[in-house]
Design a protein with these regions (language model features):
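Positively charged n-region of N-terminal signal peptides that target proteins for export
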Residues: 1-4
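Bacterial N-terminal signal peptides
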Residues: 6-17
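Boundary at the C-terminal end of the N-terminal hydrophobic targeting segment
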Residues: 19-24
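Divalent metal-binding segments
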Residues: 26-32, 41-297, 310-357, 361, ...
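Distinct, well-ordered alpha-helical segments
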Residues: 263-265, 291-302, 362-375, 398
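Phosphate/diphosphate-binding loops
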Residues: 274-308, 382-393, 419-444
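His/Asp/Glu-enriched, well-ordered alpha-helical/loop segment
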Residues: 343-353, 360-383, 393-397, 408-530, ...
Length: 564
């Protein structure tokens, strides 16, 4: 009889959220007396949870979970603080952002040009003369009281002895004279394709270079790279910065300026067991016209899903074919090329994420997807479209039928005023149509598209989701398109995990799942909406390891020794 009863008790404990770990082994860590937002329908909130061997073994009341503690268990009193599942950015260019983290200045949270210049000045004071200072994006003039871009004179006053490069999205960059000299730019002929030096009415250069994606990416390519050892260290630092904001995972869609060596610092941290963020990455298109050939070659050595829980290859995108990248009027030949790539990917059961900005042209992409789907059902592959802020009900309906998900970022937080001016209020009030997509049952992943376009701060993105306001405070979306706080949090956790086939392993807090979580500085569910963006983590755990801790929990951060 004993052999029958024990399994039944284990099942009962597991379904109650307490797991089967009560038999014989103590938890490594127990968190007590908190407000735990689990996103588990069976137990939406809890007071405590226990962790062992990197996984959650119990979730429930403090009294129940305390039973999992024993000799050697680390006990953490949450003192009523809110805990959420670890945040997962479903579309962040984290690998690239990490490489320049040490030399970059961010303007996140600055509300005036003098405040932004103070950050430049502080960077100059801690830098050697001649050392580069870079603002690689993540800002807009709408965040400043002045509602304008900074000037070259303002940069010079803040950093007279350093070359300074300030990027505005992928449309413009401001350089100081020292930066122009270092990059050997004196005339328009020296500017990468499609770009030009902006000049005032009297012909005097303003310091700004105006262009498009190839222009600005070409400029960035000219900036000096850190050494390999420096890149490893700054990647470690950048991931800790993400941990400070409760981020435990990212999906990286490749990007401009990324070459094979760009991935080596990430791989080094992985090999050393020193990653603190789970990274899932995809392969950006390489040679124009040779995209399919390149995918076929690379994936013979790097198959779909290769890696582990910390670093894993997850297919191709976000640029799948150069001829279809930001192309609203593709030729039949370009559509055929995309079809051949998608057809091959479907035959290999490979995931794809596709960059697409405008609803007016997304029918070209959907036509290709439907053609592939008639031959090989694509819903099981969890393909996705990224961006598409103005998606129409018709486009969303076609996505739903195909089983294609939507990777949504807070572009309208930074670009809302410009979108409103260009498209008008009727389009703005539905940009993006979050609740329309949710009610259709389309999988949605939350993210930022950081860091050249937006800030990597997930709480800024979450605040924008629920209040619909731009960085300048302009209301945009209709109330009917505003998700609840829990819905928004779900996009950033379980929603993002779905796209990497991880929703059964992470994204919510329940027994058996990976112990990825964040203890927050404020109650995400009840703090004033306008304060959500100021939220940070006091403690971040990934796989049971406390990778970031501050304030009352600083003692718990686990420092991994540097490799020999």
């Amino acid at each position: 009889m004993k052999s029958i009863i024990a399994p039944l008790v284990a099942v009962a404990l597991s379904t109650s959220g307490l797991g089967s770990a009560a038999f014989g082994q103590n938890a490594d860590t127990v968190l007590l007396n908190g407000k735990i937002v689990t996103l588990d329908a069976a137990m939406p909130t809890a007071e405590a949870l226990a962790v062992r061997d990197g996984k959650i073994v119990a979730v429930g009341t403090s009294a129940d979970v305390r039973a999992f503690a024993g000799a050697g268990t680390r006990m953490i009193d949450l003192e009523g603080r809110t805990v959420v599942p670890g945040l997962i950015d479903s579309h962040m260019h984290a690998i690239r952002a990490a490489l320049f983290y040490a030399t970059e200045v961010n303007w996140i949270g600055t509300s005036s040009i003098p405040a932004a210049m103070e950050r430049i000045k502080a960077a100059a004071q801690r830098s050697k003369p001649g050392q580069w200072i870079i603002v690689a994006g993540g800002w807009t003039e709408q965040q400043f009281r002045e509602k304008r871009r900074p000037t070259q004179a303002e940069l010079l006053a803040a950093a007279p002895d350093n070359p300074v490069y300030v990027q505005l999205f992928y449309s413009a960059a401001l350089l100081t004279p020292a930066a122009y000299k270092a990059l050997n730019i004196t005339t328009d002929a020296d500017v990468p394709p499609s770009g030009k030096i902006e000049r005032a009415a009297d012909g005097t250069p303003t310091g700004w270079i105006i262009g498009d994606n190839p222009t600005i990416s070409g400029l960035f390519d000219k900036l000096p790279l850190p050494t390999f050892d420096e890149s490893v260290e700054v990647t470690r630092q950048f991931f800790r910065e993400l941990n400070r904001l409760g981020i435990t995972g990212v999906s990286d869609p490749g990007g401009f300026n990324l070459t094979a060596p760009s991935y080596q610092p990430l791989f080094k941290l992985w090999q050393d067991g020193a990653l603190t963020v789970r990274v899932v990455y995809s392969l950006f298109a390489q040679r124009r016209g040779k995209e399919l050939e390149d995918y076929q070659t690379v994936t013979q050595m790097l198959p779909m899903g290769f890696g582990d829980d910390w670093l894993r290859f997850n297919g191709i995108g976000e640029n799948v074919a150069w001829g279809m990248y930001n192309n609203d009027n593709p030729t039949e030949a370009q559509k055929e090329q995309l079809y051949q790539i998608y057809k091959w990917a479907a035959s290999r059961r490979m995931t794809i994420t596709q960059h697409w900005n405008n609803n007016r042209s997304v029918h070209h992409l959907l036509d290709v997807l439907e053609r592939v789907d008639r031959e090989t059902p694509i819903a099981p592959l969890r393909w996705s479209i990224a961006h598409l802020n103005d998606a129409s009900p018709e486009s969303l309906g076609r996505m739903k039928t195909l089983g294609v998900g939507w990777l949504m970022q807070n572009a309208m937080y930074f670009n809302g005023e410009a979108f409103l001016k260009a498209r008008g209020n009727e389009a703005m009030r539905l940009a993006p149509p979050i609740m329309t997509a949710l009610k259709l049952g389309i999988p949605i992943g939350g993210g930022t598209d950081a860091h050249r376009v937006m800030s990597y701060n997930p709480f800024v993105s979450l605040q924008w989701m629920v209040d619909g306001k731009t960085v300048g405070g302009t209301p945009t979306r209709d109330e009917e398109q505003l998700p609840t706080r829990e819905e928004a949090l779900r996009f950033y956790t379980l929603g993002s995990a779905w796209f990497t086939f991880d929703d059964e392993r992470r994204g919510s807090l329940k027994a058996g799942k990976l112990a990825d979580l964040a203890v927050l500085t404020r109650d995400y569910l009840t703090t004033p909406t306008g304060d959500i963006g100021a939220t940070e983590a006091l403690l971040t755990m990934v796989g049971g390891r406390i990778v970031y801790a501050a304030g009352p929990y600083a003692q718990f951060e686990e420092k991994r020794p540097a490799p020999p």
